[in-house]
Amino acid sequence: KLKKNITDKTDKMIEEYEAICADLGLRLKTMSMGELITELEKGLKPKVENIDFIAFSARKIKEMEEAGRGGSAKSYKTTIESLKRFIKRDTLNISEITSGFMEDYEKYLKDRKPLTKRVLGDRAISMYPGYIRALHNLAKKEYNDEELGIIRIPWSPFAKYLVKKPTPAKKRNLPAEVIKKIITLPDGPETNIGLTRANLAKDVFALSFFLIGMNTADLYNCDCISDGRITYQRTKTKNRRSDKAEISVKIEPEAMPLVEKYFDRTRHRVFKFYKSYSSADGFNAAVNRGLKKIGELVGVDDLEFYAARHSWATIARNDLHVNKYVVHEALNHVDDAMKVTDMYLKKDYSQNDDANRRVITYVLTGDDGVKKRGKK
């Protein structure tokens, strides 16, 4: 296989040399060896003006989507749309991406007016240039061949321009009493689409909390419910993990009314959200819009869906002192230091189940289980 790869590259290089010599015509007969080498080097120099960074990025984003990396594709697509607004056109010669260009783009991100009511945070100002750097590196990997001395993209703007480190994300966890307010909030009269969406958002938020922070993409896509458990592969990370990021969550009694309310009777999926929304992104957007109304009712500015997941983890760890590794596992995260050990262990979700039971009881009743354990 290695021999074939070398042969293919050599054949390609010979073809390029032959094409250059053919273009030289009769001049070739009068040239010295040094002059010929100069002409060959000139002919092999990259025509960088033909490398459109926007078109290249669109192709890479499509590859991500086809590989099932929808979340990553969405982030890169948002970045490229921002870049197009900055340059005010749909094409960008890769040679234009210099350290000065990136500094101007960063300033644009800091100064520009947001397209929505939400302010573009420091994390986005860091993330967008970071995604551009990643795409630029992919382009260099594709168009350059250092082994054969073919360098079509010689610039390294990110050697001088350093992507800023993001500021720590704003903590999105809510105290137990606020979570209880959201969960127990009565449905509003569905007199308009806004109130209907708010009721849905409240239910989905509660469902997520009861299911250990299950996110909207997984609530939308999951298709396995059996023996009182929902088993699913986490959409965000399943393509990056050997275990497909699979996890099983016990349906606690408090979650059952919501499971039954949104249950898909056709059994194509666990929940029928896909019948009302054509994509997980559309479903997520509707839930987050509805949560803004719920936030107003419970006194939380800019309430976000992910607060359910963050709050579950914080309450489990800080209020109930659940073992940090159990919280880590319940959130379906991977500990690199434990990867080898995990290969030998059969998955056991009982500790996750116990932690979830304690969290739900604590939020709804205030009972942290300490007295009960002390009596034993």
Regions found by a protein language model. Name each.
Residues 30-117:
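Basic/aromatic-enriched alpha-helical hairpins
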Residues 82-85, 95, 115-157, 214:
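N-terminal DNA-binding recognition helix of tyrosine site-specific recombinases/integrases
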Residues 179, 252-301:
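Active-site/catalytic core of tyrosine-dependent DNA strand-transfer enzymes
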Residues 206, 210, 214-217, 309-333:
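C-terminal catalytic core of tyrosine-transesterase DNA break-rejoin enzymes
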Residues 220-261:
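Conserved tyrosine-mediated DNA breakage-rejoining catalytic core shared by Y-recombinases
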Residues 224-231, 301-302, 322-345, 366-376:
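Short, polar N-cap/turn motifs at the start of nucleic acid-interacting alpha helices
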Residues 234-240, 331-361:
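Catalytic-site neighborhood detector that most strongly recognizes the C-terminal catalytic loop/helix
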Residues 253, 274-278, 338-339, 351-376:
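C-terminal secondary-structure termini that scaffold catalytic or DNA-interacting sites
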